[in-house]
């Protein structure tokens, strides 16, 4: 397990490129900046790069790169690439890639790829497949 975590950190240790401005510990992080670790935001956030670590937002999250870690949002999460880790949110999830980990949603999950792990939702699931080691099940 320790070897896998180290490998994931090496693979996903890339810079975050933030399109919108938001405050991180009193400073404004602009396009071209980078941060690794825990990020909290009260507004909508759009990231062209990847996320490594924990990310919390009260608004929508839009990510262009990969995510390795935990994402929590009270808004929508929109992602085209893959997610490795845990996703919790109260809004909709719209993903074009795959998820490796756990997904908890109070909103709709709209997915074109596969989920390897566990998916729990309180609302509708559209075009979602859950793959386990013992078989393949459509929700």
Predicted regions, residues:
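Long terminal segments
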Residues: 2-52, 57-62, 66-68, 73-74, ...
């Amino acid at each position: 397990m320790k070897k896998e975590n180290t490998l994931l950190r090496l693979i996903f240790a890339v810079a975050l490129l933030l399109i919108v401005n938001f405050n991180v510990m009193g400073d404004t992080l602009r396009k071209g900046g980078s941060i690794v670790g825990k990020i909290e935001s009260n507004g909508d956030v759009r990231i062209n790069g990847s996320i490594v670590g924990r990310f919390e937002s009260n608004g929508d999250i839009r990510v262009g790169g990969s995510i390795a870690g935990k994402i929590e949002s009270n808004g929508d999460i929109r992602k085209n690439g893959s997610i490795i880790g845990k996703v919790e949110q109260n809004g909709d999830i719209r993903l074009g890639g795959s998820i490796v980990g756990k997904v908890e949603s109070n909103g709709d999950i709209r997915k074109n790829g596969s989920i390897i792990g566990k998916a729990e939702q309180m609302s509708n699931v559209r075009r979602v497949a859950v793959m386990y080691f013992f078989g393949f099940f459509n929700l």
